[in-house]
Amino acid sequence: MVYFQWEIKPTKNRRTIMKNRKLILAVCAAMIMSMASCASSSSNADSSKAESSSQTESSSVSESSSVTESSKPDSSELTDNHHKYDNMTAEQIVAKLSLQEKANQMALPQILGLSMDSVKKNCYGGVLSKISAQSAADWRTTIDTIQKNAIGSQTGIPIIYGQDQVHGIYVCYNSVIFPHNINMGAANDKELMYKVGQITADESKLCHTLWTYSPCVAQSVDPRWGRTYESYGSDLGRITELSTSFTKGLLDGGLIVCAKHFLADGNVKYGTGEQGDIKMLIDRGDATLTDAQADELMKVYKAQIDAGAQTIMISHSSVNGVKMHENKKYIDKLKNELGFKGFIVSDWNSVQNTSAKTYEEQIINSVNAGIDMFMEVDTADEVVSTIVKAVGDGRISQQRVDDAVTRIIRVKQEAGVFSDPMFEKLETKQKDVGSEEYRKVAQQLVEKSMVLVKNDNKTLPLKKGTKVYITGPAADHAQAQCGGWTMEWNASPRREIDGVTTIQKGFEQLAQQNGITVITDKSKAAEADVVLLCVGEQSYAEWNGDTEDLALCGKLGLEGNKEAIKEAKDLGKPTVACIVAGRNVILDEADKKNWDSIVMCYLPGSEGQGVANVLCGNAKFSGTLPSPWYSDVKQIGTNDCWLKKGFGLKYE
């Protein structure tokens, strides 16, 4: 492990501090990624090297120092502090708290750099997870230590620990990594989505994490958006049905749900991306909506509220030029017209990108707009002091603070956090993450989410006795197969990930029982009857995936795509192209013509044997495109496309 020591000259300017900090973290990440690349041939998006640390906070730098045995209060300190609230309503609890204690409940600092003394002193409303992986046992230790300090505090209110469960417990070793939401949209199976919710809840509880920042209910309308794969697609009806089923599974499994990102994060216009320290093409941009269009998007959130979602996260983006973190119009609609009784949480440091000139004004405006808890990851104490001061001078009303904290306390009470903060009554269906039972469900989703878009000469399914040459950079690449938000935020530099069966390994496992010979040696490729060409995109997250170039062999294409495509063509064999990507990438017309079969796999996650099952005919194609597939970026936003939403061939 490499450590870096840096010295920054003191400054009173908070923005300068943040900018310097980001620069240091970016340099650290770039150096680490550079070293990792020497041992791996995988290639991540260039921009991720500089920016992934703004999320992961360079987790290699002694993250364990803030959670230690010495931080834990002794048992005498834990006896009664949270039990004093046992017979009180949320309103009664809030009435007992000082203004300082109330403001602390509105803060959501990140665990990295957070001392347990600070948790015990301030008793924050929640703690945001780090975005790097560890074992389930280590997660339990980490979260239990924080909770012991919270309930051992004078205030004694338990925290809720929040984590992005984007496609399973992606920061836990050996957990089930489900296909991404774009696959869920292609599968379009409500019953399976409910099961995914239950499994995610069970594995999350095995890590002692109760608050999940999911589902993402974005309507993805432009594939150039880097978060396209986090969406179920472009059809609002499909998004509503699938996300609601998922939410019900999470809730029945015992989690606190957070629907996101309110409002219109997937409807932003290309070219309006946020222009701060990082220049984005589309992410966090502006959506131009009529009232009728906004009302249609609100229906998805109404369904989430009716299903029981307890929290909603605000989008980084804007609607009609107003940042959602200060957009009182729509937040009021959420609480008043849609009847949302839970609490609203901000997204990562996004208050800092609102219109006010000072951070103090930004916080005040966001509170008054209706945000209840603040994910300002390393300025939590500044958020708290600003709220206290603003109530004192009348810029924030006491009523607004009481409403926010009542909502937070109510969610904690109803989720059982007060009655069992240390998970002593915890019940899970499995003893550990990554069970075979849960992997089978993930494999089912892989099989149902694959979309067959071309199958000339009935090349598929592969027949017994077929010799298959497997080639291409996505064939045996766990990270490419799982996509972003896997082990880390933007992507792990490793090709191999614990518990992941790649497409190639899946074929090798099934070869004998299906009477198929798998060839991976280039020198023997000419012996093959069929070429299985596995190509796709690099892994990325958020704005790192924003691109004007959607070509399969473009800026975000996997290194080796071009060479593998040429190799397959030169062999002159029937070719099955498997596309492993987070969106409908643009294919070369000649390639579309040359390939006998084309299969869109999207990002199938850990169970790559599901791909082999379908191609060998053990399972049938049933997936359909969740969004249109364009032939050219010029078609985006028009009715012209290569394949329409809902298209998908099946075996005859």
Tell me the role of every PLM-derived stretch.
Residues 41, 63-65, 69-652:
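Glycoside hydrolase catalytic-domain context in secreted enzymes
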Residues 39-71:
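Short, low-complexity, disordered segments immediately C-terminal to signal peptides
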Residues 34-37:
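C-terminal motif of bacterial Sec signal peptides marking the signal peptidase cleavage site
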